[in-house]
């Protein structure tokens, strides 16, 4: 409250708390009201924003609170969590939109530290595509698991610079001891990759470098295939020759019965690893397949937020289109854990929960931003949803499995898919 009073942007008018001992009391000059009074308080105090200051609440309780606010003409935002405040990662006046996990309605599963450590602790780890959405989050989590050295590999100078700077701040702030190396390069340069593996004696590779925007790859087929297919082939072959212990491909649900070039390129990348795994290689190859990640550069969430900020409309391809979703930290955490389970050629599939209709996600985001979607609402308080049609190669619904055979792994969120594969010599012939 004191932080809000120091600025001009916010004018606090009332507290709302479900603690009956606090209700009807006055704190710092503000009345403490009951949650059920909020609908009446909004017009009474001309409230335009509600700030959630419940950092210790359970995910279930947070969702209950957010659901109760969805229908009100207010913008719902949040303050940082206790853990972020204690770690110095945020300050109390850093108010932001609600967490993506709250939009999703998923409860994060506590990680199994022993799995994360198996491929990382005291090892030299390399991440390709280190500056991307998934790659950068893998790096953030890897540095906290005590690697001997982390090699960042990316073809984008700015992305590489940004993640290196961020990681050095994390390392310094947490007093971590590890070497950090940032290397510019392309996964399409096989000699460069093998040289890097050998020079730094890389033990574990997380291959996150890929073009993932479906429409972009659809219109840039040659580059998409060169990067996603041949880049994976070169990276994996170089790992095999250099004696890398573990090579993990970050894959996608779009690789299952693909209807677009991006999905087909990722399925070919999977087939390369499945084939290589049968070559008596010293390298343990595996792949982790999951759906969309909220907040990534290819996600609808940043697009929807920008469209809402601009006053709409919010564009959705089809009323029935649905996708599996997961937050970036959760996806990265599960990739690190799955990589420790592979024996060779494993296809791991993450439990993505129930698919989410994109139009429902759009409606929730619009309402939590304080706008209405009803046609009879005033134009100044309404954001329209516009259906623009499925894009070339786009499915209504995605799948995570090629067949129906899957087995558990001992981790509630990670399954092993039992799928057919082509012998490596046949894969090579197709690629050549």
Where in the sequence are the language-model features?
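Proline-aspartate-enriched helix->loop->beta-strand connector
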Residues: 42, 46-49, 147-148, 197-206, ...
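NAD(P)-cofactor binding segment of oxidoreductase domains
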Residues: 63-79, 149-156, 198-199, 219-246
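A solvent-exposed beta-alpha-beta segment
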Residues: 1-87, 155-164, 181, 185
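N-terminal Rossmann/SDR dinucleotide-binding element
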Residues: 93-101, 105-201
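Hydrophobic/aromatic anchor residues within beta-strands of the central parallel beta-sheet
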Residues: 182, 224, 285-288
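Conserved Rossmann-fold NAD(P)-dependent oxidoreductase catalytic core, especially the SDR/UDP-sugar
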Residues: 88, 207, 211-270, 275
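Strand-loop microenvironment adjacent to phosphate/nucleotide-handling motifs in alpha/beta enzyme folds
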Residues: 110, 117-119, 241, 275-293, ...
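Flexible, Lys/Arg-rich cytosolic regulatory linkers and terminal tails that connect or flank
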Residues: 23, 30, 35-36, 62-124, ...
